[in-house]
């Protein structure tokens, strides 16, 4: 089922319903009560808002439904339906992959250009007077100018009321000047660089399969923030110093390594990370095993698995439950494994990737819901 995460959540269905019904109510007030031009009905506002909140498909399909319903309400006004669908489609296309806030306002010019095209086309086709065409053009241009501004305000309101995390918020979380990322750069520079590389890899993978690439990048930036606690116990942060794990037992080493998950969740809560981002912290390991220290412990008891409590070496989970968290789990493991290959070549890298994916599927990554 398409976007089961959205359509199985009553709050998201309520949000979509509220936006669509509000548009129809406004249309009724503008046309029947105030008797203004139908071109003041803010159909494109709903299209932009739903596209940013969810995705382009939901934004487009809801616009089709609302445009047709409002057109019928106006007495089968086909001109309104055509103009609304054309302009809203242009708007949806322009912000389908939002990467910066200014993109929302540059969409304003695309909407205005679309307004000019559709009004002149309809006017010429119906042989309307130029006075009528110019009047409709002025009205629709005003609508197109205000649409992104109103959308920007609505996004902030819906994020607060319905606890939705939009791409606009995710973009803000990528800012290196955010307190948590600045702290990560300062205290765990090795881990931070690793996270940037994993973010690039995860974003590319997500783009290739049609997943949420921006969310993958943001999740990668924050997935290892728990390593700021006891940073020097993680190999990427060990520069000239000795490996502290050499002086402690494998069970203690595994405990310290596993603790970065809970520490990360605590930091995420402290710094107010959205749940959709903090979910990457426990899910990027799922319930996999801290293999290196498990093997050390196994060697210490002569290979007798019955003498080892395996739960001491497993991450608490949960397993990834979205495409994005699944992608990060695989990319994070691949980045670390490929970096360890001596004299790497294409064949060695491909073999390692196949091995990692197979291991993750067998030990933590369920593809049933992904």
Segments the model singles out, each with a brief description of its role:
Residues 2-192:
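Generic detector of multi-pass transmembrane helix bundles and their immediately adjacent loops
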Residues 43-45, 88, 196-200, 261-262, ...:
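A generic alpha-helix surface/boundary motif
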Residues 107-113, 135-140, 175, 215-225, ...:
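A glycine-rich phosphate-binding loop feature that marks nucleotide/adenosyl-phosphate handling sites
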Residues 181-343, 359:
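Divalent metal-dependent catalytic cores for phosphoryl transfer on phosphate-bearing substrates
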Residues 337-366:
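C-terminal structured "cap/appendage" subdomains that terminate the fold
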Residues 368-370:
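Conserved small/polar residues in nucleotide/adenosyl-binding loops
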